[in-house]
Amino acid sequence: MNHLTNQYVMLHDEKRCIGCQACTVACKVLNDVPEGFSRVQVQIRAPEQASNALTHFQFVRVSCQHCENAPCVSVCPTGASYRDENGIVQVDKSRCIGCDYCVAACPFHVRYLNPQTGVADKCNFCADTRLAAGQSPACVSVCPTDALKFGRLDESEIQRWVGQKEVYRQQEARSGAVSLYRRKEVHQEGKA
């Protein structure tokens, strides 16, 4: 499938993210995510001590990348996992048989089998709730530092963000292009 110009994309601005997990909590509440699982979280990565006594670390969003060539879609035996016309990788819960193939195939390890329903679950940009009502995803709406941007790839504000040189996408050879863009920043803490 070709990378759609009108598809939905998200940008996680690591320069603005403070790792507060407000996005994780909002998602869990709205989507009734069971204890011990998540559709989105922010991880702290690359802690290292620099020679000047500063600690360097990075806040990284971990969620579905909405891959162009999603391995989770290609392994699904029932067609429950699919990429919709907006570029969102979805799970049709009525067709999911809980085989776990999509969970195992995800190169980013962001799917899980919901123990309450027995079907696969993951971030879908709140497509069936907030997005359907014309609102941005829950994570975007609660971010206190405006570190998350969401919109269609052909919108001017989104184009401005994704065109910056610091913006990158986490790639995996078998997934193709992904719809989660990131602006990298390494935070510092300590004495200079």
Swiss-Prot record:
[4Fe-4S] cluster 1 binds at C17, C20, C23, C143. Binds 4 [4Fe-4S] clusters per subunit. InterPro entries: 4Fe4S_Fe-S-bd (IPR017896), 4Fe4S_Fe_S_CS (IPR017900), ET_IronSulfur_Cluster-Binding (IPR050954). Component of the PhsABC thiosulfate reductase that catalyzes the reduction of thiosulfate to sulfite and hydrogen sulfide, with menaquinol as the sole electron donor. Proton motive force (PMF) is required to drive transmembrane electron transfer within the reductase. The PhsB subunit transfers electrons between PhsC and PhsA. Residues 8-36, 55-86, 87-116 form the 4Fe-4S ferredoxin-type domain. This is Thiosulfate reductase electron transfer subunit PhsB. It is found in: Cell inner membrane. [4Fe-4S] cluster 2 binds at C27, C123, C126, C139. Composed of three subunits: PhsA, PhsB and PhsC. GO terms for cellular component: plasma membrane. It is a peripheral membrane protein. Keywords: 4Fe-4S, Cell inner membrane, Cell membrane, Electron transport, Iron, Iron-sulfur, Membrane, Metal-binding, Repeat, Transport. It comes from the Bacteria. PANTHER family: PROTEIN NRFC, PROTEIN NRFC HOMOLOG. [4Fe-4S] cluster 3 binds at C64, C67, C72, C106. Its cofactor is [4Fe-4S] cluster. [4Fe-4S] cluster 4 binds at C76, C96, C99, C102. One of its GO terms (molecular function) is metal ion binding. It comes from Salmonella typhimurium (strain LT2 / SGSC1412 / ATCC 700720). Its main location: membrane.
